[in-house]
């Protein structure tokens, strides 16, 4: 694996592991049923995220108005959050399943953004500009260089370096933050903020249009389910030996906020689908050609 050096045949570092294939494939030591449930929920969440984008791809091809239905700021905020999440997952030494999910996020977002610009430029070709190319180039560069960030061994940070910062200080039962993990924690926090902010432009776009036509509800429904399972998979995982539960939650806090924190905003979007459903039905009936008498 690129992001974590593992010796598949060496199970000695996980003496209490109950299922060896989990260690071999994911590098996670499943010591009991909670750890096994964590892995299972994480896998299901990945399938939810993987399936969520396909209905939107199909919807975009059918309606051809994806550039009107989805807010560009929503897509940019989403892909910005996923890019930060990917970098932060490597630097903060997150669970392998978190890293796998982050990689898929970025790839799916790139395809979604490509479809958006395809329909945008199809209608107005002259809008293609250098800033958009720069954004796509930055995202592509992020995907390419992120695996290289994990090749550097973390350097332990002396306790004096965090004097006055109680959350990141080293206390009994706490796993100390390394310099690389601190950077990853900050980037992960930025990704959580971008996730939260990305929903606001889409909520506004739906409100201004008084419609959710052109958007597949399956996109948000499956993302909500995936985020719920993803957050639960992190919460069910046992802390490392000698690490307190508080320290474990602190290390994973940005990713918990990024997954569970957006559920409220996605619920608002779900309500918009219900409220504007009748409007969309009326608009669709008006566009239907009259049957010949």
From Swiss-Prot:
Optimum pH is acidic with no activity detected at a pH higher that 7.0. Glycans are attached at residue 10. One of its GO terms (molecular function) is L-histidine transmembrane transporter activity. Keywords: Amino-acid transport, Glycoprotein, Lysosome, Membrane, Repeat, Transmembrane, Transmembrane helix, Transport. Residues 59-71, 118-126, 204-214, 276-293 are cytoplasmic. Its main location: membrane. The keyword Transmembrane applies. GO terms for cellular component: lysosomal membrane; organelle membrane. InterPro entries: LAAT-1, PQ-loop_rpt. GO terms for biological process: intracellular amino acid homeostasis; L-arginine transmembrane transport; L-histidine transmembrane transport; L-lysine transmembrane transport; lysine transport. A motif (Di-leucine motif) lies at residues 290-291. Belongs to the laat-1 family. Amino acid transporter that specifically mediates the pH-dependent export of the cationic amino acids arginine, histidine and lysine from lysosomes. This is Lysosomal amino acid transporter 1 homolog.
